[in-house]
Amino acid sequence: MKSATCLTATVAAALLAAARLASATDMPSAEEMWKIIQQQQREIEALKRGQQETAEKVEAAAELAEQSQPSVSTASSWAENTQIGGYGEMHYDNLDSGKQIDFTRFVLFFDHQFTDRLRFFSEVEIEHVIASSDEDDKGEVEVEQAYVEYDLTPTQHAKAGLFLLPVGILNETHEPTTFYGVQRNPVETYIIPTTWWAGGVGLKGEITPGWSYDFDVHEGLDTSASDDYAVRSGRQKTSEADANDLASTARIKWTGTPGVELAASVQYQQNVTQGNDPNAGDAWLYEAHADIQRGPYGLRALYARWDLDGRGPKAIGADEQEGYYIEPSYKFTPKVGIFGRFNQWDNQAGGNGNNTEMKQYNAGVNFWPHPDVVLKADVQMQDNDGAKNDNGYNLGIGYVF
C-alpha cells in the first residue's frame, strides 16, 4: 500500500514537471505577444470597416427603394388615369361620278384624368391615309379635339381648348358604328359642316333631370364669295384662325325618356367672312333634331337653316342655306339593321332664280359582327333639277375601340 502511494506521487511529480517544462518552452516572448496583439487589432478594424460598408450599402439600397417607389406609383397612376381609343372606316364607292376605295379616316383618342374634377380629351385624325405636300395627296392630319374640362359642381362643367360644337346629331358622335349608311348624310355635311370643331371656351350642365344645356364661345366661320359663301368652306379648324368675329353656340337638349333625344341649337356670328368682305354681314344658324331608338325601331329627323346677311350672299341666293332629312330604321337582331333616308338640302336657297336644290335617297343595311365593328352597304339615288345626279352604291367597314 505504501509502495503504491509513493509510485503515484512520483508519477504526478513527473507529469507536473513535464507540463512546466512544456509551458516554459511554448510561451511567446513579449515581442511576439505585441505582434499578435497588433495583428488582432488590424483584423478587428477590418471587420469594423466591413460592417460599416455593409451598413452603408443597406442604407443606400433602402433609400433607392424609397426613391423608386414614387416613380413606380406615378407610372401606375398615369396608366390607370389615361385612356387610349380610336376608330376608323374604309369605303368603296361605286357611283356615276366614279369608283374608288378610300380609307377615309384613321382616328386615335387620348384622354387623361388629372383629378376627380379635372380631365383632358383629345382626338387626332388622319384622313385619306396619306398627308403630304404633293397636290395629288388628298389626305390631312388634323387635331379635332384637345381640351381640358373642369367640374364646377357634380352637374356643371367648364371647358377650354379645341372641341366639337354642340350642333346636330353626328357632329359630336360620328363613330361609324353609331350611324346607318356608309357616308355621313349630306345635310350634316353641307348645311351643318360635320365634323365641325373650334377653339374656345364653354359651359355645359344639367338644368333639371332630363334637361341639359351647352353654351360655347369660339372662333367663327370665314366664308368668301369665291366659295359662294358655303358654310362648309368657312371652317377654320383653329389653324391660325382669324378671330376678328367670334361666334356663340347654344343648345338645349331633352333626354327624359330612355332612347329619346330632342334638341335645338342656335349660333350667331357678327360677320361670316371675319370682316374681309364688305358685302357680307352676320350669320344665324338654327337647328332642331330628334333621335329616337325604341326597341328595334329607330327614327332620326333633323332640320337646319342658315340666314346670312349682306348683299353678297343675297345676290347668289346664299343668304338662305337649309336642309333636312328623315331616317327610319329597324333592327331585326342586335347585329342586323336596315334603314331608309330622304335628304334635301340647298346652299343657295335664297331664290336667285337658279334651281340649286339637291335631293338624295338612301337605303341599306348595317351588320355588326361585334358591337364595335360594323359592315355597311347602301344604295344612293339623287333627283337634282339643277345638277347632275350621282347614283350608285357604297360599301364600308368601320370599327371603334
Identify what each model region corresponds to.
Residues S329, K335-D372, K376:
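Outer membrane beta-barrel transmembrane domains
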Residues V72-T223, N244-E261, E327-F332, V336-F339, ...:
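Outer membrane beta-barrel
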Residues F367, D372-V373, N389-F401:
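Outer-membrane beta-barrel "beta-signal"
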Residues K253-A349:
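Detector for outer-membrane/organellar transmembrane beta-barrel domains
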Residues A22-Y92, F401:
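N-terminal periplasmic/intermembrane-space "pro-region" immediately following the signal or transit peptide
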Residues T104, I126, E142-E144, W197, ...:
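Transmembrane beta-barrel architecture of outer-membrane proteins
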Residues D93-D96, A131-D134, N185-T189, G234-T238, ...:
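Extracellular loop and loop/strand-boundary signature of outer-membrane beta-barrel proteins
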